[in-house]
Protein backbone atom coordinates (compact mmCIF):
# COMPACT_ATOMS: atom_id res chain seq x y z
CA UNK A 1 0.00 0.00 0.00
CA UNK A 2 1.34 3.42 -0.97
CA UNK A 3 0.14 6.74 0.48
CA UNK A 4 1.11 10.30 -0.45
CA UNK A 5 1.81 12.26 2.74
CA UNK A 6 2.39 15.92 1.91
CA UNK A 7 0.78 19.32 1.55
CA UNK A 8 -2.30 18.94 -0.64
CA UNK A 9 -2.44 15.18 -0.04
CA UNK A 10 -2.90 13.07 3.10
CA UNK A 11 -1.68 14.50 6.38
CA UNK A 12 0.37 12.48 8.87
CA UNK A 13 -2.59 11.16 10.86
CA UNK A 14 -4.55 10.17 7.74
CA UNK A 15 -1.47 8.39 6.44
CA UNK A 16 -1.10 6.47 9.71
CA UNK A 17 -4.71 5.31 9.43
CA UNK A 18 -4.31 4.23 5.80
CA UNK A 19 -1.05 2.38 6.33
CA UNK A 20 -2.25 0.91 9.61
CA UNK A 21 -5.30 -0.57 7.87
CA UNK A 22 -3.07 -1.90 5.10
CA UNK A 23 -0.78 -3.59 7.62
CA UNK A 24 -3.78 -5.21 9.33
CA UNK A 25 -4.66 -6.71 5.94
CA UNK A 26 -1.15 -8.11 5.58
CA UNK A 27 0.11 -5.57 3.07
CA UNK A 28 3.56 -4.06 2.99
CA UNK A 29 3.61 -0.27 3.20
CA UNK A 30 5.51 2.56 1.54
CA UNK A 31 4.82 6.23 1.01
CA UNK A 32 5.56 9.38 -0.92
CA UNK A 33 6.96 11.72 1.69
CA UNK A 34 8.07 15.33 2.21
CA UNK A 35 8.18 16.25 -1.47
CA UNK A 36 6.97 19.82 -0.99
CA UNK A 37 7.02 20.36 2.78
CA UNK A 38 8.10 18.74 6.01
CA UNK A 39 4.83 17.34 7.29
CA UNK A 40 6.03 14.45 9.46
CA UNK A 41 5.95 11.93 6.64
CA UNK A 42 9.44 10.59 7.27
CA UNK A 43 8.52 9.98 10.89
CA UNK A 44 5.35 8.17 9.82
CA UNK A 45 7.37 6.01 7.44
CA UNK A 46 9.64 4.99 10.29
CA UNK A 47 6.78 4.42 12.75
CA UNK A 48 4.88 2.23 10.29
CA UNK A 49 7.92 0.21 9.25
CA UNK A 50 7.63 1.32 5.63
CA UNK A 51 9.98 -0.51 3.30
CA UNK A 52 10.59 2.76 1.47
CA UNK A 53 9.82 6.47 1.42
CA UNK A 54 9.93 8.37 -1.89
CA UNK A 55 11.02 11.96 -2.68
CA UNK A 56 12.28 13.30 0.71
CA UNK A 57 13.21 16.73 -0.64
CA UNK A 58 12.49 18.52 2.65
CA UNK A 59 14.34 16.80 5.47
CA UNK A 60 15.85 17.54 8.87
CA UNK A 61 18.49 15.47 10.70
CA UNK A 62 15.88 13.85 12.96
CA UNK A 63 13.96 12.66 9.88
CA UNK A 64 17.09 11.05 8.48
CA UNK A 65 17.82 9.39 11.82
CA UNK A 66 14.28 8.00 12.01
CA UNK A 67 14.64 6.40 8.58
CA UNK A 68 17.99 4.92 9.56
CA UNK A 69 16.63 3.42 12.78
CA UNK A 70 13.66 1.90 10.93
CA UNK A 71 15.71 0.55 8.02
CA UNK A 72 13.47 2.39 5.57
CA UNK A 73 14.93 2.83 2.09
CA UNK A 74 15.05 6.42 0.79
CA UNK A 75 13.93 6.41 -2.85
CA UNK A 76 15.25 9.57 -4.48
CA UNK A 77 13.57 10.90 -7.62
CA UNK A 78 15.70 13.73 -9.07
CA UNK A 79 13.63 14.02 -12.23
CA UNK A 80 10.74 15.52 -10.26
CA UNK A 81 12.53 18.60 -8.89
CA UNK A 82 14.09 19.02 -12.33
CA UNK A 83 10.68 18.88 -14.02
CA UNK A 84 9.13 21.24 -11.49
CA UNK A 85 12.06 23.66 -11.53
CA UNK A 86 12.34 23.53 -7.76
CA UNK A 87 16.05 24.26 -7.63
CA UNK A 88 16.76 21.83 -4.79
CA UNK A 89 17.13 18.08 -4.50
CA UNK A 90 16.94 15.41 -1.83
CA UNK A 91 19.89 15.37 0.63
CA UNK A 92 21.49 12.23 -0.78
CA UNK A 93 24.88 12.78 0.84
CA UNK A 94 23.40 13.29 4.30
CA UNK A 95 21.27 10.15 3.91
CA UNK A 96 24.17 8.02 2.69
CA UNK A 97 26.57 9.27 5.33
CA UNK A 98 23.96 8.57 8.03
CA UNK A 99 23.69 4.97 6.84
CA UNK A 100 20.26 5.18 5.20
CA UNK A 101 20.02 2.91 2.13
CA UNK A 102 19.31 5.05 -0.93
CA UNK A 103 17.50 3.95 -4.09
CA UNK A 104 17.09 5.90 -7.32
CA UNK A 105 14.16 5.99 -9.76
CA UNK A 106 12.50 8.14 -12.42
CA UNK A 107 9.08 8.83 -10.85
CA UNK A 108 7.86 8.80 -14.46
CA UNK A 109 4.42 10.44 -14.55
CA UNK A 110 2.59 12.88 -16.84
CA UNK A 111 2.44 15.71 -14.31
CA UNK A 112 5.83 16.30 -12.74
CA UNK A 113 8.36 14.02 -14.44
CA UNK A 114 7.50 12.83 -17.96
CA UNK A 115 10.80 10.96 -18.29
CA UNK A 116 11.45 7.24 -18.53
CA UNK A 117 15.21 7.81 -18.69
CA UNK A 118 16.94 6.16 -15.74
CA UNK A 119 20.34 7.08 -17.18
CA UNK A 120 19.37 10.74 -16.81
CA UNK A 121 18.48 10.11 -13.17
CA UNK A 122 21.92 8.62 -12.60
CA UNK A 123 23.47 11.75 -14.10
CA UNK A 124 21.31 14.02 -11.94
CA UNK A 125 22.14 11.99 -8.85
CA UNK A 126 25.82 12.69 -9.44
CA UNK A 127 25.66 16.29 -10.67
CA UNK A 128 22.90 17.60 -8.39
CA UNK A 129 22.89 15.31 -5.35
CA UNK A 130 26.67 14.71 -5.25
CA UNK A 131 26.49 10.94 -5.34
CA UNK A 132 29.39 9.06 -6.88
CA UNK A 133 28.71 7.10 -10.09
CA UNK A 134 29.12 3.86 -8.14
CA UNK A 135 26.64 5.01 -5.47
CA UNK A 136 24.13 6.06 -8.13
CA UNK A 137 24.37 2.73 -9.97
CA UNK A 138 23.94 0.76 -6.74
CA UNK A 139 20.96 2.97 -5.89
CA UNK A 140 19.38 2.37 -9.31
CA UNK A 141 19.87 -1.41 -9.23
CA UNK A 142 20.15 -3.53 -6.09
CA UNK A 143 18.83 -0.90 -3.67
CA UNK A 144 15.85 -0.22 -5.92
CA UNK A 145 15.19 -3.96 -6.09
CA UNK A 146 15.18 -4.14 -2.29
CA UNK A 147 12.77 -1.18 -2.14
CA UNK A 148 10.31 -3.40 -4.04
CA UNK A 149 11.07 -6.46 -1.90
CA UNK A 150 12.66 -8.12 -4.93
CA UNK A 151 16.31 -7.92 -3.99
CA UNK A 152 16.42 -11.70 -3.70
CA UNK A 153 15.47 -12.03 -7.39
CA UNK A 154 16.93 -9.08 -9.29
CA UNK A 155 19.19 -6.05 -8.94
CA UNK A 156 22.60 -7.73 -9.00
CA UNK A 157 24.48 -10.47 -10.84
CA UNK A 158 24.44 -13.39 -8.43
CA UNK A 159 23.82 -17.15 -8.73
CA UNK A 160 20.13 -17.94 -8.42
CA UNK A 161 18.87 -14.51 -9.49
CA UNK A 162 17.10 -13.67 -12.74
CA UNK A 163 19.54 -12.65 -15.46
CA UNK A 164 18.41 -9.05 -15.99
CA UNK A 165 21.56 -7.59 -17.53
CA UNK A 166 22.56 -4.48 -19.48
CA UNK A 167 25.86 -4.35 -21.39
CA UNK A 168 26.99 -0.76 -21.87
CA UNK A 169 28.91 0.85 -24.73
CA UNK A 170 31.17 2.71 -22.32
CA UNK A 171 34.80 2.41 -21.21
CA UNK A 172 33.80 2.31 -17.52
CA UNK A 173 30.88 2.82 -15.16
CA UNK A 174 31.55 6.55 -14.74
CA UNK A 175 30.39 7.22 -18.30
CA UNK A 176 26.83 6.24 -17.34
CA UNK A 177 26.70 9.44 -15.28
CA UNK A 178 28.91 11.54 -17.55
CA UNK A 179 26.63 11.39 -20.64
CA UNK A 180 23.41 13.19 -19.66
CA UNK A 181 20.43 11.05 -20.60
CA UNK A 182 22.19 9.16 -23.39
CA UNK A 183 21.20 5.54 -23.99
CA UNK A 184 24.53 3.70 -23.91
CA UNK A 185 22.92 0.27 -23.73
CA UNK A 186 24.54 -2.11 -26.20
CA UNK A 187 22.68 -5.28 -25.23
CA UNK A 188 19.81 -5.94 -22.85
CA UNK A 189 18.79 -9.26 -21.32
CA UNK A 190 15.58 -9.76 -19.33
CA UNK A 191 15.36 -13.04 -17.50
CA UNK A 192 18.28 -14.23 -19.60
CA UNK A 193 16.51 -13.47 -22.88
CA UNK A 194 18.33 -11.09 -25.21
CA UNK A 195 16.27 -8.18 -26.51
CA UNK A 196 16.86 -6.09 -29.61
CA UNK A 197 19.57 -3.45 -29.30
CA UNK A 198 17.05 -0.63 -29.65
CA UNK A 199 14.01 -2.12 -28.01
CA UNK A 200 10.54 -0.73 -27.43
CA UNK A 201 8.46 -0.74 -24.27
CA UNK A 202 6.22 -3.44 -25.73
CA UNK A 203 9.23 -5.69 -26.30
CA UNK A 204 10.26 -5.35 -22.67
Tell me what each language-model feature is:
Residues 3, 52-55, 165, 187:
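Well-ordered beta-strand positions
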Residues 2-39, 108:
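Metal-coordinating catalytic core of metallo-dependent amide/deamination hydrolases
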Residues 28, 38-153, 168, 172, ...:
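Active-site-adjacent C-terminal substructures of enzyme catalytic domains
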Residues 6, 79, 191:
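Cofactor-binding loop segments of dinucleotide-utilizing enzymes, especially the Rossmann-like FAD-
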Residues 2, 103, 189:
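Conserved beta-strand segments that form the floor/walls of ligand-binding pockets within enzyme
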Residues 176:
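Charged C-terminal helix
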Residues 139-143, 150, 158-165, 182-204:
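Mid-to-C-terminal alpha-helical segments outside catalytic/metal-binding sites
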Amino acid sequence: CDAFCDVGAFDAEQTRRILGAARELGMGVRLHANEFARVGAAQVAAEMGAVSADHLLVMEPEDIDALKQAGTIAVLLPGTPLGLGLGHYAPARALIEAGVPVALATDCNPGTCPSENLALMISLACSQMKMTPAEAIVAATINSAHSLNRGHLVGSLEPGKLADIVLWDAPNHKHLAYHFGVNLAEMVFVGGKKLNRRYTDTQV
